[in-house]
């Protein structure tokens, strides 16, 4: 009987220690690196990566099958819930900044060569000609459809994608009851609870 008590105490102690384990996950995503530290008895490395991949499937211009890439090519006006979240946050920040933040700048970004390589800088005339395609007033969300009010409008969500990736991982942790975590993707950070003291 005494041995059984010792075994049970030992198991409780081991399980208690496992709950205090801080886990670390890191790698490359969205053209940058990520670092995630969280306290959990479960290893969520695969799930963390899956949450980040949701952003690539929806908002990456480098994934030709992403929602935003198909929308830009005019193949579909239908968008997914993550795209809608991005659009609504982008519109909100656009209004707060008086238009300084604008995800419809993709034609200008591409002309300057940041997205798709371009050897020479665009002329003032080229820039002026592209401005007709820039502005949140050029698109309208209608349920699960994002309608182009001006043909030629494109979006570049790279300025908001890393933050959305961080939010998705944090929401996953919250659903799983993880109380202590730090998520960083390319400088975008979200923390909750206590830090790892080691």
Please provide the spans of the model-predicted regions:
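Short active-site segment of divalent metal-dependent hydrolases/proteases
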Residues: 165
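Hydrophobic/aromatic-rich core segments of domains that either
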Residues: 23, 179, 187-198
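Penicillin-binding protein/beta-lactamase superfamily catalytic region
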Residues: 168
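Short beta-strand segments
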Residues: 184
């Amino acid at each position: 009987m005494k041995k059984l008590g010792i075994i049970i105490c030992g198991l409780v102690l081991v399980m208690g220690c496992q709950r205090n384990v801080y886990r670390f996950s890191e790698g490359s995503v969205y053209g940058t690196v990520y670092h995630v530290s969280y306290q959990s008895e479960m290893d969520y490395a695969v799930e963390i990566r899956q949450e980040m991949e949701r952003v690539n499937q929806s908002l990456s211009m480098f994934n030709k099958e992403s929602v935003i890439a198909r929308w830009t090519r005019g193949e579909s006006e239908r968008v997914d819930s993550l795209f809608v979240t991005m659009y609504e946050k982008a519109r909100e920040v656009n209004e707060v900044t008086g238009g300084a933040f604008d995800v419809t700048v993709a034609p200008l970004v591409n002309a300057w060569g940041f997205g798709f390589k371009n050897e020479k800088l665009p002329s003032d005339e080229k820039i002026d000609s592209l401005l007709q395609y820039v502005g949140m007033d050029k698109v309208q969300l209608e349920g699960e459809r994002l309608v182009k009010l001006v043909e030629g409008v494109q979006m570049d969500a790279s300025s908001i994608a890393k933050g959305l990736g961080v939010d998705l991982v944090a929401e996953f942790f919250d659903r799983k009851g993880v109380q202590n975590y730090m998520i960083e993707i390319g400088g975008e950070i979200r923390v909750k609870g206590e830090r790892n003291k080691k």
